[in-house]
């Protein structure tokens, strides 16, 4: 039968304790979630500023749909680039300090547009080993284009420099997450940027988990490290995490963005997002810009969680961000701990291989500005009870 090999692989996934299943939420994304009639404190989403359920954003989204219709009808380069898209791109450029941006339907598509478009035969890509899956796929596409691809040990700047120094490639592209999605740690961007300058390389930064959260006004990891909007940087940010809506952008120089517009396949051959999404994101951007209190509360809750879990036998990785990984190790043990928390009204997902390396199954605790001091205290108490 044609499906036999699929059933065999599915059985292997199940026997390894790696079967994934979707949870159907009966309430909007927010601090609380209702699943199968159970009310839960939500520590699973990437809604870092609590904007996904923001009523003002929702009203702008609805008004935008009434004014601009339900869909864009085409790709950006045919007839799908409407006024709200153009306005949003200009506002993101101003906010991030770059001359120009392009918007995409997802961060995955944005990442697929950048590295494979920049890198071809005779070029070289240098990528952190813990980069997001979308960056890994982008790297593979660059390899298919003829580029040489090397992966350096996680955040190992010395190893990266050795690779750059030994390379004779015509063009060099360094690719890294800014905040690593499963560990929550930061890339040493000032050191990596210095290497990009020294070896005349592009620096592609995925700031999916930094945009809106880090920096003096939420502008992201570059602001956090006080780095310039350099012409050699291409910055990707997602708009469905801290921004609370959906989509992504790539920011860069006028020339680099024009090049992506002309040659980026995942930009050219994708229908543009509904214009109402762009309307909602313009409102979200305003709330991020004015969101100092939200970010301050988020950092307070992160500090409270880390202080409260400091004595646990399980290792809490050294993350300064909203992503707080608690290493359990064994796949089944991680799932069992997640289930026990669920039974106590706390939704904390277990993350297992292949998303993370074997032997490092973990709880991925996502902290939000919407969480209260009491919420964090409840989670700490439950983990101490179960540890």
UniProtKB/Swiss-Prot annotation:
Q: Which keywords label this protein? A: Biotin biosynthesis, Pyridoxal phosphate, Transferase
Q: Which residues form a coiled coil?
A: none
Extract the signal peptide range.
none
Please list the residues that carry the modification N6-(pyridoxal phosphate)lysine: 241
CDD domains, alphabetically?
Answer: KBL_like
What are the cysteine partners in each disulfide bond? none
According to its UniProt record, in which pathway does this protein act?
Answer: Cofactor biosynthesis; biotin biosynthesis
Catalysis: reaction(s)? 6-carboxyhexanoyl-[ACP] + L-alanine + H(+) = (8S)-8-amino-7-oxononanoate + holo-[ACP] + CO2
Say if the entry is tagged with keyword Transferase.
Answer: yes
Give one GO biological process term: biotin biosynthetic process
Q: What is its EC number?
A: 2.3.1.47
Where does this protein hold substrate?
Answer: 20, 132, 355
Residues recorded as binding pyridoxal 5'-phosphate, renumbered to this chain, are: 107-108, 181, 209, 238
Q: Please list the cofactors this protein needs.
A: pyridoxal 5'-phosphate
Q: Write out the GO MF terms.
A: 8-amino-7-oxononanoate synthase activity; pyridoxal phosphate binding
Q: Tell me, in a sentence or two, what this protein's role is.
A: Catalyzes the decarboxylative condensation of pimeloyl-[acyl-carrier protein] and L-alanine to produce 8-amino-7-oxononanoate (AON), [acyl-carrier protein], and carbon dioxide.
Hey, which family's this protein in? Belongs to the class-II pyridoxal-phosphate-dependent aminotransferase family. BioF subfamily.
Q: How does it assemble?
A: Homodimer.
Q: What is this protein called?
A: 8-amino-7-oxononanoate synthase
Q: Which organism is it from?
A: Dechloromonas aromatica (strain RCB)
């Amino acid at each position: 039968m044609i499906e036999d090999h699929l059933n065999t692989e599915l059985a292997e996934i199940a026997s390894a304790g790696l079967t994934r299943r979707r949870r159907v939420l009966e309430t909007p994304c927010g601090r609380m979630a209702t699943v199968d009639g159970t009310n839960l404190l939500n520590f699973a989403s990437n809604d870092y500023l609590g904007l996904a359920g923001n009523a003002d954003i929702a009203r702008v989204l609805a008004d935008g749909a009434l004014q601009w219709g339900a869909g864009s009808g085409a790709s950006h380069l045919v007839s799908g680039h409407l006024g709200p898209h153009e306005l949003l791109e200009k506002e993101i450029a101003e906010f991030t300090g770059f001359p120009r941006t392009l918007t995409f339907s997802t961060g995955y598509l944005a990442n697929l547009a950048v590295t494979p478009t920049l890198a071809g035969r005779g070029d070289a890509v240098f990528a952190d080993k813990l980069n997001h899956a979308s960056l890994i796929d982008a790297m593979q596409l660059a390899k298919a284009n003829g580029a040489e691809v090397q992966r350096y040990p996680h955040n190992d700047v010395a190893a990266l420099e050795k690779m750059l120094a030994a390379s004779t490639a015509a063009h060099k592209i360094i690719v890294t997450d800014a905040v690593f999605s499963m560990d929550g740690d930061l890339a040493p961007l000032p050191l990596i940027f210095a290497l990009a300058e020294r070896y005349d390389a592009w620096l592609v930064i995925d700031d999916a988990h930094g945009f809106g959260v880090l920096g003096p006004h939420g502008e992201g990891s570059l602001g956090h490290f006080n780095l310039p909007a350099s012409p050699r940087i291409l910055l990707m940010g997602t708009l469905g995490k801290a921004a609370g809506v959906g989509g992504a952008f790539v920011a860069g120089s006028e020339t680099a963005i024009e090049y992506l517009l002309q040659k980026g396949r995942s930009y050219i051959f994708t229908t543009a997002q509904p214009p109402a999404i762009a309307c909602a994101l313009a409102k979200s951007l305003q709330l991020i810009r004015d969101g100092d209190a939200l970010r301050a509360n988020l950092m307070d809750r992160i500090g409270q969680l880390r202080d409260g879990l400091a004595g646990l036998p399980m290792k809490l990785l050294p993350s300064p961000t909203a992503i707080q990984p608690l290493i359990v190790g064994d796949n089944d043990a991680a799932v069992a701990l997640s289930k026990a928390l669920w039974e106590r009204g706390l939704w904390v997902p277990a993350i297992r291989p292949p998303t993370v390396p074997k032997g490092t199954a973990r709880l991925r605790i996502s902290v939000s500005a919407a969480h209260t001091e009491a919420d964090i205290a409840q989670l700490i108490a439950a983990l101490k009870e179960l540890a």
